[in-house]
Amino acid sequence: CTGHGNGIYLVDAALQSVRNAIFSADARARSYVERWTAAGIGQAVRPKTMQSLWPGQPNALLAWLRDHEPDAYARTRWVLMCKDFVRLRLTGQAAAELTDMSGTSLMDVGTAQYDPDILDRFGIGDAFDKLPPLRRSAEICGEVTPAAAAATGLAPGTPVAGGLFDVDAC
C-alpha cells in the first residue's frame, strides 16, 4: 500500500487517534521552519536528513503541537504517517516504514535510523520515544486482525507489508 507522505497521524497508548490528522499541505508550523532556517538548523541537519525543511513535515508539526496542543502532544504514544496509520488499523501493530520516514527530517538517511541529535536541534528531543519501530517496504508488519477483516471485507490473517512513500511508489 502507499499513502501521502509527511503530515502527521497521532495515536495514544491504546492505539486510538489523539486528534484529527494534519496533512502535509498544512502550513500552521511555518514560523518554526522560518526560525530553524534563520538559525541554520536546516543546513546543519541536511547532510543527515537530505531534506529541505517545510511546514508539513512531522518535525515542524510536532514542535507546533507541543506548543499549541500540549495535551495532545503528551497523550501521543506513536507518530505515524498516513499508510502507517492504515496499517496500524489493519494489524494493531504500530510501525513506521523506512521510505516514508526518510522524508520527515527525523532520521539520518545514511544510517536508516532515527537520530536523537536531529530531534534535539528541532527542540523535540522528547519526541524520540514517540517514533515507532522502522520497517522496510516489503517487510511483513502484521496480519489483518479479525476486527479489521469484519470492517473491510479482507480475509483475516492476510499479511500486511510496510508499503511505500507516495513519491517512491511512482
Regions found by a protein language model. Give the residues of each.
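Ligand-binding clamshell of periplasmic/extracellular solute-binding protein-like
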Residues: 1-4, 163-167
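Active-site phosphate-binding/coordination module
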Residues: 1-59
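Short beta-strand scaffold segments in enzyme catalytic cores
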Residues: 6-11, 104-105, 169-170
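Glycine-rich phosphate-binding/hydrolytic loop that grips phosphoryl groups
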Residues: 34, 165-170
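Gly/Ser/Thr-rich active-site cleft segment
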Residues: 45-165
